[in-house]
Amino acid sequence: MKLIVGLGNPGEKYAQTRHNVGWLVVDELARRAGGSWRKDGEAEVCEVRLGTAPGEKVLLVKPQTFMNTSGKAVWPLMSFYKLEGEQLLVVQDDLDSPFGLLRFRLGGRHGGQNGVRDIIARLGYDRFPRLKIGISRPPAGRDPADWVLSKWRDEERETLAELVRLGVGAAELWAVQGLAEAQQMYNGTDLRPQPPAPPAAPAPAADGAPGDAQD
């Protein structure tokens, strides 16, 4: 058994906010696997099998405690199933990565993400994988707390849908083949618009072309 935890806040008003991108990933994982959600303590959970049949047994988790106390939902499940840190993947939003970036990280500090902060505090260790999905820092003068609870703009939705699709593939690869394979495949993901290439330099004129000086 492995756990894939999508971080977010419960309630319709939070469903399409930046902070809930982790929920979008686990919801899509559940949909593709044909699973159904049920209540289990402080979480909604969905048991699925990922990968080639018979597949890897995975419990998808959506904490129902609100973001800042996510560990309250995660710790009992880790304890009940007697899981270690490497069997847990947390899918989270990441303020410090530009929107369009997706990457795995093993362990380390919470980086200001309060759901991760609480999971670390309740588990008593930080050595578990995270799948970090960039949402960018807010525009100058805007409070980060307000930014993470803001809804996606219409012009961001195409990139968001692709990030979620890639996040699903990344989480499934982690579950089936492990962190190293998933990092190698997905840590270069960058969906940011690329600047246009500079115009090519004009080719040098051939000898004897019009305008050349002649002997």
Curated annotation (Swiss-Prot):
Comp. bias intervals (Low complexity): 203-215
EC numbers on record: 3.1.1.29
Compartments where found: Cytoplasm
A GO molecular-function descriptor: peptidyl-tRNA hydrolase activity
InterPro entries named among the record's database cross-references: Pept_tRNA_hydro, Pept_tRNA_hydro_CS, Pept_tRNA_hydro_sf
Annotated active site: 19
Cellular component annotations (GO), alphabetically ordered: cytoplasm
Binding-site residues for tRNA, renumbered to this chain: 14, 66, 68, 114
PROSITE patterns reported in the protein's UniProt record: PEPT_TRNA_HYDROL_1
Enzyme kind, highest EC tier: hydrolase
Biased composition (Pro residues): 193-202
Stretches for region Disordered: 185-215
Coiled-coil ranges per UniProt: none
Keyword Cytoplasm: yes
Keywords: Cytoplasm, Hydrolase, RNA-binding, tRNA-binding
Catalytic reactions of this protein: an N-acyl-L-alpha-aminoacyl-tRNA + H2O = an N-acyl-L-amino acid + a tRNA + H(+)
Sites annotated Discriminates between blocked and unblocked aminoacyl-tRNA: 9
Similarity field: Belongs to the PTH family.
Function: Hydrolyzes ribosome-free peptidyl-tRNAs (with 1 or more amino acids incorporated), which drop off the ribosome during protein synthesis, or as a result of ribosome stalling.
Family matches, as PANTHER family: PEPTIDYL-TRNA HYDROLASE
The protein's name in its UniProt record: Peptidyl-tRNA hydrolase
Gene: pth
